Amino acid sequence: MARVRRLQQLTPEQIDTLAGVLIDCVEGGASVSFMHPLSPQRARAFWQDVADELPGGTRALLVAEDEQGIVGTVQLLLAQPENQPHRADLAKMLVHRRARQQGVGATLLAAAEQLAREGGKTLLVLDTASADAERLYARAGWQRCGTV
């Protein structure tokens, strides 16, 4: 079972590993704001941007690790308009294809929900285009609010 932890900063090695997870997910057809083929440079630039936001507390980054290293990640976007302090957005739920069907996504989701509760968030919002991901969220009790 993968272990989940929150990262407050990213090392260059972690950025490279997360870039690999992102590239794998995009290659596998994930709808996560990037098109295939995704270059390693572009993937690393994305994670560097995430790393730059972590110290400010506007974004929380969780990673799932197995004996080989990082196999999944999810983010909570915590900065919301002043009339929505109760809300956070769940973003970039990524699980490497080699680690799927092992409970990594469910473990990441539960950890993100717990972190949100600890931060006083009572509403979590996400979007997904994946039937597999939609089933994961439904099993965890999430409700569909609309289709775009």
Give residue ranges: language-model regions:
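Conserved beta-strand-loop-alpha-helix junction that forms the acyl-donor binding cleft
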Residues: 100, 124-135
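Conserved catalytic-core motifs of GNAT/GCN5-like acyltransferases
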Residues: 125-127, 138, 143-148
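Residues forming the Rossmann-fold NAD(P)(H) cofactor-binding site
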Residues: 102, 106, 110
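Conserved GNAT acetyl-CoA-binding A-motif
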Residues: 109, 116-129
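Active-site acidic-Proline motif in GNAT/NAT acetyltransferases
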Residues: 96-98, 102
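Short glycine-rich hinge loops at helix-strand junctions in the catalytic core
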Residues: 103, 120, 141
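Acetyl-CoA-dependent GNAT
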Residues: 5-92, 96, 109-111, 115
